[in-house]
């Protein structure tokens, strides 16, 4: 079992370059199944979720080549084989294979999605959309079987009962080769949705309105190959901005799109964080006299649920008390118990996180309970005096490309250890 060991309390300086967006690429790769020629992705992050998706694509018959941050996928040999639960249960994003296999073959048998345990994340919205387009859905143990083999998928008007990034993207993927027009109302607006729509349009799809709450898709018969650059990972960027404000003596974060982080940066400015924003980078100064604030997550363009955990250690540096409420994932509080082991003044009650800043953290043994909780513990370990050991680190490696190397380059005493 591997663990991350950190000797904290060191000031960090330098530059970090943000990788391609995890939450985009995990949808882009399954979407490539719809193409009838080679698709090349640039700026692909080196994370375990990508490695798992590549393995699945190769099992299905795709030819995949990877060099540096470039991924070249030839989907012409893909066969519609069942993908049982055991092979894909580590991936929340495995549900994107539902849309792509339905779109290409008219049927799919795929294991139910896994990923981080953050509370109820039902796929009902996905199934409702597929059924509106003419598919049938049935559970077979831990697998989902979908079929539109007899009639094919057709366009439909679909209203999302709740705003859902995954369901919006999956519906787009399924609809691009459906017969007729599909309209998605109350669609999610995240940048990753625009990124997936851009890839599909570059492959020959007809999608309008991505990034708004109404998306219109006119089905086409075929999609061709293309080359596409993955957008920068706004969650990775927000994580390193939080880290820079917590322990930095001046850190520049490169390959950042400010417009994707406006809600997050507004809250940092409310705290008193000093930073300079330029065209594609953010320079975070050394901080002092930070103010405690309240955080409430919301769908984009609000404060991202994926950033409330990485921000928490910085909040613990601030003066005063505050609350954090995650309206998206009710169980996104497990990092609280681990931070408390590090002597943080933090607790949770009825889904609300209550914290008081200003107390020094101390290193100890903690466990990453999910991806973003793991990021929070890394930041806390860098802040703390003494040694911090983080176990269950596979969660962290799922979503943060080259995290050990990037932090070492800033001067961190951090290493990956085989236990």
From Swiss-Prot:
TM spans, by residue? none
Q: What is its EC number?
A: 2.5.1.7
Per UniProt, the enzyme's principal EC class comes to: transferase
What are the positions of the active site? 116 (proton donor)
Write down which residues bear the modification named 2-(S-cysteinyl)pyruvic acid O-phosphothioketal: 116
Location(s), subcellular: Cytoplasm
Q: Which GO biological-process labels does this protein carry? A: cell division; cell wall organization; peptidoglycan biosynthetic process; regulation of cell shape; UDP-N-acetylgalactosamine biosynthetic process
Q: Report one GO cellular component.
A: cytosol
What molecular function does GO assign, one term?
UDP-N-acetylglucosamine 1-carboxyvinyltransferase activity
Positions bound to phosphoenolpyruvate: 22-23
Per the record, the pathway is: Cell wall biogenesis; peptidoglycan biosynthesis
**Which reaction is recorded as catalysed by this protein?**
phosphoenolpyruvate + UDP-N-acetyl-alpha-D-glucosamine = UDP-N-acetyl-3-O-(1-carboxyvinyl)-alpha-D-glucosamine + phosphate
Q: Give UniProt keywords alphabetically.
A: Cell cycle, Cell division, Cell shape, Cell wall biogenesis/degradation, Cytoplasm, Peptidoglycan synthesis, Pyruvate, Transferase
| Gene3D superfamilies according to UniProt | Enolpyruvate transferase domain
Summarize where UDP-N-acetyl-alpha-D-glucosamine binds, as residue positions.
Answer: 92, 121-125, 306, 328
Asked whether the keyword Cell wall biogenesis/degradation is assigned, the reply is yes
Family according to the record: Belongs to the EPSP synthase family. MurA subfamily.
- State the function annotated in the UniProt record: Cell wall formation. Adds enolpyruvyl to UDP-N-acetylglucosamine. Target for the antibiotic fosfomycin.
User: Any remaining note in the record?
Assistant: This strain of S.pneumoniae has no heteroresistance to fosfomycin unlike other strains of this bacterium in which MurA1 is required for heteroresistance along with other as yet unknown factor(s). Heteroresistance is the ability of a clonal population to grow one or several subpopulations at a frequency of 10(-7) to 10(-3) in the presence of a higher antibiotic concentration than that predicted to be effective by measurement of the minimum inhibitory concentration (MIC).
The family database entries (NCBIfam families) matched by this protein are listed as: murA, PRK09369.1, PRK12830.1
The protein here is known as UDP-N-acetylglucosamine 1-carboxyvinyltransferase
Species annotation: Streptococcus pneumoniae (strain Hungary19A-6)
Gene it is expressed from: murA1
